[in-house]
Amino acid sequence: MLAAANRTGVRLIIPLVDNWVWQGGRAEYAGWRGKTKDDFWTDPQLIADFEQTIRFILTRTNTVTGVRYADDKAVLCWETGNEIASPPAWTREIAHYIKTLDTNHLVMDGFNASTLRAESLDIPDVDIVTTHHYPGNKKSFAELIRANAEMAKGKKPYIVGEFGFVSTAQMAEAMQAILQSSCSGGMLWSLRFRDRDGGFYWHSEPGLGGNLYKAFHWPASTMGADYDEINLMAIVRSNAFAIRGLTMPPVSVPSPPKLLPITDASEISWQGSVGAAGYQVERAANRGGGWQIIASNVDEALTQYRPQFADEHAPAGEWFYRVRAKNESGLSEPSNLVGPVKVANVTLVDELADFSKIQERSGGWKLATHDCRAAREDAQRAAGAAGDGLLYQLPPAIQSYRVFVFFPKEEGDVKFSVSDDNQHFHEIAAQKEIHFHGAGEYGYWKPVLFHAENISSGKFLKIELTGETQIGRVEISHPALSP
């Protein structure tokens, strides 16, 4: 990470401990010694343990760069902790200890508050102060930021370390407060990067985020419409240049994506390009040319932790694929070429963003986009109840199906049947795969994969529910047509 930061000119704020349990925090330090998490601030043994960790980190030599962390220019500052409730005496001791090991870097007080603590401004070894802002305060983010900036003015640099989970208008107002005050900068919560297996990493916010907000993705897409991602990201980009006194340049044409190996034409993924708003997928019968555009504006945010594209209409045969990234400034050069990919069957893939791929539906089906954490970040689902049904029509004959479902309450069953004429159906027994380790603190729903192979009959597939169920994805394969 430090090597990458140096290559790209990024500077890192690195917290040395977390207040929360997710990455391991003060409770874990205390637990190792049989003490309580509040002892972390005053117990000599726990403080010594933490200082041992600090010494290990700061004096470690990076095996990639050959540079000690304490000497690495990629580090902007060491933060005493993330959102910690540290007493001033603890902060004073830890900040001083950091400075005895590292005279090259700044120290930021990680005390968790929306209003600056006066004591932090008086600690000599604290160089930067910060606040975090989320819903729940009587004052607006902008009011608090202006007051904090005035309080820190002439004493220490002030950074808004996190802010989020409010409307675009309120976020824009907060950014203006950062720009117009003596504040040194601000960071939205939060931005997730691309997955090496294709698409993005996802993080929905069921707590303070109210089951509405998710981590943002650049350059944004309609998948974030519920929280106005496209408009907010445009405002962020504008202000990122404004705070540096720079004129905002046009968006660059994206670089070519990297197409990943393809074993099935229904499972095509690529590593995306920075700034790409969509992707053009192309297919050809040979390496030399004759490329056909088979999809012109694929949104890589449409799927979560699944392949980004299925070539549902590939003719039988062997095919080559490539992908181009695109945005408002133009089209990238082609990706690497992958193939030949042998196609005997093709697969209808329905992510349930809408009901457009369904021939008929019965009952009270609704599209569900909230509760994504409980659904393992699946952002588009069809929610139904006992007796509800879906009907898909495909070219004959259906070969196999896979249906990914969640049971928000009790685990139920799903019935599957096929027909040649949409009149006479016979049931196809499904196998069930369950990978579930409990609801956990987020109330995860039970995920179940229903699947059947070697069907070789029918052109209609009926799906019937026996209880409250949400379907996240449907895959139905059938023979590919001749070229």
Q: Could you say what each language-model-derived stretch is?
A:
Residues 311-329:
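Beta-strand-rich modules
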Residues 400-401, 458, 466-483:
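Exposed low-complexity, polar/acidic, P/S/T/G-rich flexible segments that act as propeptides
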Residues 375-400, 410-411, 447:
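Short beta-strands within extracellular/lumenal beta-sheet-rich domains
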Residues 12, 89-100, 106-274:
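Substrate-binding clefts and catalytic carboxylate motifs of secreted carbohydrate-active enzymes
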Residues 325, 463-465:
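Conserved structural position at the C-terminal beta-strand
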Residues 1-128, 132-139, 154-156, 166-167, ...:
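Active-site mouth of glycoside hydrolases
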Residues 340-369, 483:
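Extracellular carbohydrate-recognition regions
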Residues 326-345:
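Extracellular fibronectin type III
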